[in-house]
Amino acid sequence: MDYNMDYAPHEVISQQGERFVDKYVDRKILKNKKSLLVIISLSVLSVVGFVLFYFTPNSRKSDLFKNSSVENNNDDYIINSLLKSPNGKKFIVSKIDEALSFYDSKKNDINKYNEGNNNNNADFKGLSLFKENTPSNNFIHNKDYFINFFDNKFLMNNAEHINQFYMFIKTNNKQYNSPNEMKERFQVFLQNAHKVNMHNNNKNSLYKKELNRFADLTYHEFKNKYLSLRSSKPLKNSKYLLDQMNYEEVIKKYKGNENFDHAAYDWRLHSGVTPVKDQKNCGSCWAFSSIGSVESQYAIRKNKLITLSEQELVDCSFKNYGCNGGLINNAFEDMIELGGICTDDDYPYVSDAPNLCNIDRCTEKYGIKNYLSVPDNKLKEALRFLGPISISVAVSDDFAFYKEGIFDGECGDQLNHAVMLVGFGMKEIVNPLTKKGEKHYYYIIKNSWGQQWGERGFINIETDESGLMRKCGLGTDAFIPLIE
């Protein structure tokens, strides 16, 4: 990757001098080293002032760590004030550009160092945040040494990331309890930013990443908090489950002798998918997956657009574990035994707040008669004729930072997340090597991480025309609720 500058370092100095010195002063004064020192000092002091304002814990600014979403916020004014000077911006950009050029020049040496040491337990294998090429600076061993918001060199090398982190805090209403916690989160943020940037510079990938609300979490933290699907066990004695032996009978009822196009079908275009929701800080993906497919059945079979209560399942599905995870099939089992589910208006979602089961909150409930296990080689057929499917998938940190495109990244090492399969499609993409168009098939997945994640809450995962390619174990567990 090449980082090009539109100007040379000496041009920055000249332009800054012309801005700060009166136009009537003799031109020889512009070359004086004292002027250069003043300019640099002003830039450094501005950035240091920004950091002092944001990262010094005191009584007036303690709200930053406990509540960063203050309505009457002067943060934008401070950021704009610091960045409105063309001289200050050019100076900082030149420093960042210089640092990035250094990073690229050292990349190969660092990779060789990593391979030679084969140290899989390092906190972070990557390039130093500083510019000295010393072994102690090639890796982050001591975050307190590297993350120093009062170090001018650190600020100059990371001004862009610091501003990016500030915007991340504000956009996602992040709350940190102390400056030390903020430093730790900033370190994780930098590591995730590095991964995202490296991926997005790979022209051979079919998808793009972005820093989202998970950017200050390690993958281990993210997995423990959001990937809560439990290992599935066959329900041999279930009186509600129609197993794969019953599949042909059910599909014949809805399909008949009709053939279908294996290239594309999207239930979102046929009023069969309700809006994307957000499970927030609760490991309740199993509830959102199962409730979502029930909502789709009522939309398709009854022409009713309803929003049902995931919270009732979280509170009352005793075969599952609330915010600590669960199983899709257990959700359907309990849904039937509860006699149906209230609407979200009657039983609203409160995420991880403690809530006792209260099945009497509503008089009208929406239930299912039974549910069907879908063979993993019949996903496209079942999706086309029966409707959206509640499925399992093995999620990784690549998946977590998905932005757009067809996901062809790394998968998790086990099934850990419940989502909905709502469609499939095909897109022709030009191969950057052959310069020829190639057909790429994908499944359309509805997630439960809000509409700000991915493609408005959805992700496209690569497959083949037949749908037999099931990346990330997609559809290993696959169930459709039946209301007729």
From Swiss-Prot:
It is a single-pass type II membrane protein. The active site is at residues 285, 417, 447. One of its GO terms (cellular component) is extracellular space. Residues 1-35 are cytoplasmic. GO terms for molecular function: cysteine-type endopeptidase activity. Glycans are attached at residue 67. This is Falcipain-2a. It comes from Plasmodium falciparum (isolate 3D7). The gene is FP2A.
